[in-house]
Amino acid sequence: MSVEEAALALWAKSGNPFHPLLAHMLDTAAVALAVLRMEPPRTRALYAEDWGLPEEGALAWAAALVGLHDLGKASPVFQAGWEEGKERVQRAGLPFGELLDWVAHGVFTELFLRRLLKEKGLPERAANDLAAALGAHHGFPANAEEKSRARRHLRTEDPLWKEARRWLLEEVFRRLGAPLPPSQGNGEARPEAVLRVMALASFADWVASDPSLFPYGRDPRRGDYLKEALRLAQEALNRLGWPAFAKAQRREFGELFPYIPKPNALQESVPALLEGACTPVLLLVEAPMGMGKTEAALYAHHLLQAGLGHRGLYVALPTQATANGLFPRVRGFLERLGEGSRLELQLQHGTALLNPHYAGLLERAAPRQVGEEEEGGAVASAWFSARKRAMLAPYGVGTLDQALLGVLRVKHHFVRLWGLMNRVVVLDEVHAYDVYTSGLLQALLRWLRALGSSAVVMTATLPPSRRRALLEAWAGEEVEGQDLGPYPRVVLVGEGVKARSLPPAREVEVALEVLREVDVEPLAQRLKGALPGAVGAIVNTVDRAQDLYRALGEGTPLTLEELARRLGGISGGQAWEEVRQALPERGGEVVGKVLTDGTLVFLLHARFPAEERALRGSVVLALFGKGGPRPPRAILVATQVAEQSLDLDFDLLYTDLAPIDLLFQRSGRLHRHERPRPEEHARPRLLLGVPEDLDFGKPLYWDKVYEDYVLLATWRALSGRDRLRVPGDLEALLEEIYEGENPESFPEGLRERAKKSLKALQERRDREANTARRLSLSELDRLLAYWDEGALVAQERLEDDEEKAETQRLLTRLGDPSVAVVPLFRVGEGLFLDREGRRRAPLKGEVSREEAEALFRRAVRLSRFPLPQELLKEEPPPAWRKSGLLRGLRPLEVGRVFRSGERAFQVELDPELGVVYLPV
């Protein structure tokens, strides 16, 4: 038989009917072409620029490469995997010799394309990089051992197999009409060009491999096969909700933010700085809370999208709670921007499905009944809601971690980067990250610029060295010596650097009172003595928050229903609406306690099960936020969850000593809004807890949360002060503490300790910075450099939701291992979600979607040693492993004891306190 007949006999998908290999290759190429034709002109221009070809030629070239992703299936190893298909291939004249051990087809794809692309005329380096990229379409490039095993097979292979593969490659190029790109200078393909093909191959394959979208059995010999495949591809993208790009018309600020009567100085500076921008830019906004940074960033996105043709927006925040809080605001903005058109918007973090606003968008995107029109406005299509695909949606709100996974070699990291390509990426609260995460952030900024994206970086506070590192990561050169003006400021880095200083929205003088007695009992008395009013206490650890809540006194558990009754009903803003919606089903849940004098006391931290934490967060925002009824006597005890992005407003605030930037963040929760206040709280006052002996270790454990030196330096800078100007004093204090690190300036009794703690801090910073450089794609040319230290992650073959303790540290945050658990109560012989034994936990058999969601809503992440280490050794129930929602969770029986040496603790779940560790 002929080479053509042999090649056409090869199969890609088994079954009756089967799907020929050439057919699947053309299907995948068609999806790639259809995707690119729906993308903005600027995305297509990037592909053309990558390869030095006219636009149509560049798209055909990229699509042809994508089609070749499965060329490795044209191998005896793969074709022997289905007996019926193997017999057909043998009848077509392709012999099977001795088959050695199994090798994944992606490994063969790389080896085959290295040779064939060079034969085609591509320079060796470009051919090798593209071959490795296309071979990685299932998540990872091949490692040396895999390639060695594959080469052993090739040494005994019949030459007809090579001819069949060469015919397939030429046929794909012929059908697509794909030209060869002109030789690129040094013979290399730029890393961003390789990534654009690499990612497109992966997700085009996901679509083309769905038999409900691309039925098997279609004959690729037909002359109109590619035309039909393009029709199916377009229909598939329409069904999945892939949006066609619509050019944005420039709108005025007031049209998009009608609730703001007049833009402030920050918001007015954005269009002025962006005027004339013709290339992607970095916009750095340094300003305190309350200056409208979010609206400024969203308006910057609109102007950049209208001016440069960016494909969409991703807003990255430090926590799930902050992402949840911003999601409805971004949705409202996009719907005003879209004026009724359909917009694909995803909420991207691990517990997004618990968010009622996001659940509503998933419902809106569900297929309509016959005769029903599709709804306009924001929707969340199910296809994009899958973890690996969410970043492909043009609009998203989520955690920074979801973006940072793009610069770590987790499975399909390159798909995330493609999703961020030619987009406006807003990075909020960048002051909240450690040195390691900041190193990953710098790598992300380098990639965003290379991929044609713009970035808006927002921060309340930033030490000069951190600011410089971020600006230089984008600019690719030193920006030392640039006069950026005083704080608050906006800095634009484009073809040059421009900066504009702003008048603060308000200058608040906060009275500062230091409490040297930090034990919870006297602190509780001090807080109660400050009533009436809305009093807040932000402490540094969950254990301390629980202890302070207890010390405030015995009380009656406060249910949601009782809270509504005491307030005379539920009305007000968004947070109150969430509380109102929860009332019918969750009215009996405990959200706090009532003291004998009528004081309402609330507790908020991260050790509540997810649904309880979310409900408590809504209650806290409703009671201590901007609108709605405000109880006359209320105390909130919280951890750091209250210092980031939550619009809280206290009459009086206590805080444990923390780094100076975080103290300013916390002080921003004082007198945030104009409202009547008790006379004794007419002026904002901050109570600062500093232990008399300056011992931040056991039993406070503040040194486990913050660096000893930074706490000492913050205290040294604040001692003797009785007031703070917010934000007026911020920049000078930041410079003194973070840039003027000089232990010799400390009092004699602290000097040696300061020297030791500064040395430890500098060593940790160096370690974290080096770790970030090693493990991330810190430079673009490390995309396929799997021989270097960054290959550690690839060698682990990490999923991006990996739960193994030994590999967690390689992800986006350094720190102690943790595990997400579902607390279960033993009642009789069974395990239940509730202590009364009404909701049995599904541990065997199949788990329905409703059961999985119920378990997921009860999850809580724990890190107390040795709990994660022990639980991560245990296999989750088999049914949980099959569920995308549950596979990272472990069941934890309440009351279980964990031991480490002579220490032991028992895990309990208290309805008021959350997860508690009791010594035994």
Swiss-Prot record:
Q: Which residues form a coiled coil?
A: none
Helicase ATP-binding domain mapped to chain residues = 274-480
Q: SMART domains under this entry? A: DEXDc (SM00487)
* Documented effect of changing residue 73 to A: Loss of endonuclease activity
Q: Which InterPro entries match?
A: Cas3-like_dom, Cas3_C, CRISPR-assoc_Cas3_HD, CRISPR-assoc_Cas3_HD_sf, DEAD_box_RNA_helicases, Helicase_ATP-bd, Helicase_Cas3_CRISPR-ass_core, P-loop_NTPase
What name does the UniProt record give this protein? CRISPR-associated endonuclease/helicase Cas3
Q: What does this protein do?
A: CRISPR (clustered regularly interspaced short palindromic repeat), is an adaptive immune system that provides protection against mobile genetic elements (viruses, transposable elements and conjugative plasmids). CRISPR clusters contain sequences complementary to antecedent mobile elements and target invading nucleic acids. CRISPR clusters are transcribed and processed into CRISPR RNA (crRNA). Cas3 plus Cascade participate in CRISPR interference, the third stage of CRISPR immunity. The N-terminal domain (residues 6-260) acts as a ssDNA endonuclease, has no activity on dsDNA.
What does the record say about activity regulation? Inhibited by EDTA, Mg(2+) and Ca(2+).
Q: Which family does it belong to?
A: In the N-terminal section; belongs to the CRISPR-associated nuclease Cas3-HD family. In the central section; belongs to the CRISPR-associated helicase Cas3 family.
* Pfam families to which the protein is assigned, alphabetical: Cas3-like_C_2, Cas3_C, Cas3_HD
